């Protein structure tokens, strides 16, 4: 019997998923297309945290800053260098990846709360840094317009469907790449680094290099998600990447399960669905302005507690374990 390698199985699976998304995009409204694009963006952002924290054991509290690096890189690529928006998204990932590589080497000797504090300081200082350089647009930020969809896609092909295609294609390609990477030698070295750095070093693994590599890859994926975010909101400014975004992404990673990519889309769906659910609850039962503002945060916090109590390794691991118990 012909055996298919795990890499080919993943490729076939992602191709089928891409085909399903392509079919779905013609059958859903513009609102769902827009929300689907946000799900794809959050999927990438959460995956970048899972790579850094869950696989290499490095805790970042400032991933919103890495997203901002990619966002500004993408906007500058379009506005100043007149690059095609899709090329600008690639530049967003590359420049954020280089920034992450430099940061990774600088923080290679840091771990635990020291590394978390460093990334937190970066996220806190982002608005001040952005406001110091006129080329970044100050508080007003920069516009980011990807233009109209290609004419060959037809007159009925909307801007929101174009957003959906770009975001989902980016997420599928990057998650496929990441899944293959984490099942390769690099993934094994990342896990060794996470579980026991001393033993990993004795086994011949270059700790500093692998930490920097993980940071660079994570930053590149976060930068791409930042580029997708500013594409969806048509501009980039410091206010688009608050510190609260970093904590929201961490919550999404915990709901997903930080040690696996299997349920990453679940965490992304949760982050997109909660504001809509909260709005629906408020419209039904009413409430003060403070209640309306705090309800989404309360719902995320409650879900976070439930996830830690009942699915600490994520829903993907839970379903996988349940499937094996049946057999």
Where are the regions a protein language model picked out?
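Transmembrane alpha-helices and adjacent helix-loop boundaries
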Residues: 1-327
């Amino acid at each position: 019997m012909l055996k298919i390698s795990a890499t080919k199985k993943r490729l076939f699976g992602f191709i089928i998923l891409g085909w399903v998304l392509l079919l779905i995009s013609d059958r859903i409204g513009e609102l769902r297309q827009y929300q689907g694009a946000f799900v794809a963006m959050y999927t990438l952002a959460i995956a970048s945290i899972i790579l850094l924290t869950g696989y290499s054991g490095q805790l970042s509290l400032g991933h919103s800053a890495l997203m901002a690096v990619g966002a500004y890189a993408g906007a500058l690529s379009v506005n100043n260098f007149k690059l095609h928006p899709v090329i600008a998204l690639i530049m967003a990932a590359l420049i954020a990846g280089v920034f992450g590589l430099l940061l990774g080497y600088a923080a290679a000797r840091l771990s635990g709360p020291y590394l978390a504090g460093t990334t937190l300081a970066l996220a806190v200082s982002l608005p001040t840094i952005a406001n110091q350089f006129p080329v970044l647009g100050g508080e007003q930020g920069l516009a980011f317009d990807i233009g109209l969809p290609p004419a060959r896609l037809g007159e009925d092909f909307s801007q929101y469907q174009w957003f959906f295609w770009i975001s989902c294609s980016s997420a599928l390609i990057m998650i496929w790449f990441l899944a293959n990477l984490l099942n390769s030698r690099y993934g094994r070295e990342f896990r060794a680094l996470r579980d026991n750095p001393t033993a990993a070093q004795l086994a011949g693994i270059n700790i500093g290099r692998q930490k920097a590599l993980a940071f660079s890859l994570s930053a590149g994926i976060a930068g791409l998600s930042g580029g997708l975010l500013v594409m969806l909101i048509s501009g980039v400014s410091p206010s688009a990447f608050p510190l609260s975004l970093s904590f929201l992404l961490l919550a999404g990673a915990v709901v997903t399960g930080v040690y696996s990519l299997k349920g990453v889309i679940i965490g992304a769906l949760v982050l997109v669905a909660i504001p809509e659910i909260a709005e629906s609850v408020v419209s039904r039962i009413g409430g003060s302005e403070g209640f309306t503002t705090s309800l989404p945060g309360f719902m995320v916090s409650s879900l976070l507690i439930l996830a830690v109590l009942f699915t600490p390794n994520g829903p993907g691991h839970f379903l996988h374990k349940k499937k094996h118990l049946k057999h």
